[in-house]
Amino acid sequence: MFLGTYQPNLIGKGRVALPKKIRNEIRGERIVLTVGFEKCILGFSEKGWEETISPELSQPLFSDSKARDLRRKMCAEAEVVNLDSQGRFVIPEKMLAYAGIKDELTIIGAGDHFEIWETKNWENYRAKAFS
């Protein structure tokens, strides 16, 4: 389970090291990233991604426009990303732009996935959502 809040440094353009506690939950050399709903990036282990997206893929394709929209958003923007031996990876440029990440980022554990936020956006969201 992905837990905790971390503020790793960006290493160069979009390169970041996953915190060890997050990395320990991945159990592999690849992760799946996609855009989130609150201008953040969602991260999954490959198995976690399959478990998350499978129910969405079983929704009625022709009769449910909201299910189609969610499927498109989740899948069209998703990318499989390789981790190096230290758990470092490059966040795709389009995802950095979507989330507004330039200098500082925050990674939060969210149970079955983790999220990558621009730090100020996370702090603002947290202040509103948790007050």
Q: What annotation goes with each model-predicted range?
A:
Residues 1-8, 12-15, 22-81, 85, ...:
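Flexible "stalk/tail and boundary" regions
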